[in-house]
Amino acid sequence: INTTVCESTVGTLPEVRDLVADLGAVLWSVFFLVPIGRGQLLEGLDPDRAEAVLEWLHETSETVPFGIKTTEAPSYRRVALQRTGSATDAPESDAIGRRGGIIAGDGFAFVSHTGELYPSGFLPRSAGNVRDAGLVSLYRESELFESLRDRDRLKGKCGACEFRHVCGGSRSRAFASTGDPLESDPLCAYVPAGYDGALP
């Protein structure tokens, strides 16, 4: 079951959780709104409210008979690590560590109906056309995808964050908000220790 989290739906999340359980679903996919396309018509959450929802989702995940997956909220991994007292870089054998690489352009790509390759359906910057250069070469060699896979190239507080290798922030939301997919994720409330730069 898929759910979009925005200001108009956040209050219904406990009811949706109960519905997911009642229906016997095995996975609840919780999408945090990215203000792109028709998503611009909806009001997103502020960072503090999003943080509270992520904490609630993690707490909920410990008591429900189904899995919970977030989309466009990679900071859920940070919240999970902080709540469990785990290290900032989870080992690859850990479920959080294995899923740590899946964000726009890093473990995921979107091919449009015309063959354009994008890091995500929510990040409308093309790396080229798969009809001309091929999917594998564009994914592996384009500057756009290479930059998104290199978490040390992130800017702002995401670049300074000790969780950047397991989180990475929403590159789609950064792009939608700033025009630069390497900028900070404006939905994340976390400020790394010692960071004194600009906040989104």
Regions found by a protein language model. Give the residues of each.
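Radical SAM enzyme [4Fe-4S]-AdoMet core and its adjacent flexible, acidic
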Residues: 2-122, 126-127
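Accessory C-terminal segments flanking Radical SAM cores
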Residues: 33, 73-195
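Iron-sulfur (Fe-S) cluster-binding modules
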Residues: 197-200
